């Protein structure tokens, strides 16, 4: 079931092979079979995962941390059914997609009819995981003091309800949303004993792990990384403001384009202009003490934004720097054309102009003189399925 899920994620609907397999010694024409529909694939995967859940253990030991459990099978099932209920696969795909997604006989592989029942099945599958009673969200509790890399807790905004004033788990009054989220990905939270982590595959592929990905994310000029991986403006716009509102100007670059004629898909309000000055810095504690020069479109955003996005002017801590060799810590990095990590920086420039800090630990630092040297990169756990997603 898991590998069929990986296939349909990458290629869309695929042929479902018979349980007894096929005789690969026969001619292709004898064993070839058409693709199944997306719904058929999702139903098959769902059924296989139910069978697997009945046979898998409830818990994983220290030596089996990357092995699946009953909860992992049920959580993956919930994800598969959620995707099947989503607009693209539930009657809301654009006509050009429906037309293109057919088999060689012309059979439509994506449903053109909306079915509310799909959402009910996905919700019921998620409830199956929740009712196991084994998982909780990972939190870091609030602290009054800190430094630039491990900042003191910024009080979350008033939600006009009771969530902001109640302690965890009924509210966020005594937790740090920023560190709670960042720690899940940057290696602070280890796999074993993390009640939010439902499934991780581990890492056994040499130079294809998260540590190598981090080296590709780190800035070149000061971090020794490759400065390659970036996100798009659309991904950046997906993060909310700290009060939960959409960011001003969200997706405005698509206004008038095909598929964006619905005004609800973009925000017509202008993006904030100008940059943060020293006199204004105290108004934006989320930027830290080195936030001058940052575009105001990156200010007052939600905690996940600052744990994930390497925006222009963000601080890369790199606490494992070798100061005896002149390496620096807590460096403000800009990706403008005339900057060391910008377009003119030879081969090592960030193509989108917006970097990625997710999975980057404050201590992580690379060495530009050593290819893929991860000795100063914190080991990470791949959070393939988290309880927060359920």
Segments and roles (model prediction):
Residues 139-389:
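Elongated scaffold/linker segments in the mid-to-C-terminal portions of large proteins
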